[in-house]
Design a protein with these regions (language model features):
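Domain-level signature for soluble enzymes in the chorismate/prephenate branch of the shikimate pathway
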Residues: 1-176
């Protein structure tokens, strides 16, 4: 497997900013879910795949994740760790604005933020409307809840990454 990773890294070159491929990962996990049988929890199987994918991806190119989290709220941190694995560097930021700024300013390649709520005073997703702005690349959790502490909530991962359709995608529309 390492030989394949080296070949892919060389083919992408040093200019590859973000090596993750969420559409490929989603398609693969959906295929695994369709043929999954037996008592072994699919969420555990998906977590093992997330760990392997993240570790091999880190060998291709370094990337890091900014997460909205503080000393009292760990849910998004746990969701991000379940998705991106234990080897990907993650940093907690206390506010949505600080977390999203990390991707806008290219300090981190991915930000994990709470799913939009109509009641939000300062909706972060409005900032994603520009042509060069980061975009939502995935919803978390993808394959069930792992080791989440605290109140469960959905989250979105945001990055500067063009996605290819998988055929099972959801579209987010911003109307002001």
């Amino acid at each position: 497997r390492w030989d394949v990773v080296q070949y892919v890294a060389a083919a992408k070159g040093k200019g590859a900013k973000l090596p993750v491929r969420p559409t490929r990962e989603a398609s693969m996990l959906r295929r695994l879910a369709e043929r999954h049988r037996g008592p072994f929890p699919f969420a555990a199987l998906a977590r093992m795949w997330h760990e392997m994918i993240a570790a091999f991806t880190m060998l291709q190119a370094h990337y890091s994740v900014a997460v909205l989290a503080n000393s009292e709220e760990h849910t998004l941190w746990d969701l991000a760790r379940d998705q991106f694995g234990s080897q990907v560097p993650m940093t907690a930021y206390p506010t949505v604005r600080d977390t999203l700024a990390q991707v806008f300013e290219d300090r981190h390649q991915i930000a994990v933020l709470p799913a939009p709520r109509e009641s939000d005073d300062d909706p972060w997703w409005v900032k994603l409307s520009g042509a060069n702005a980061p975009k939502v690349i995935m919803r978390l959790p993808f394959a069930g809840v792992g080791s989440v502490r605290g109140q469960m909530q959905d989250a979105f991962a945001v990055a500067r990454l063009k996605l290819k359709p998988t055929g099972s995608d959801r579209t987010l529309v911003l109307i002001e």
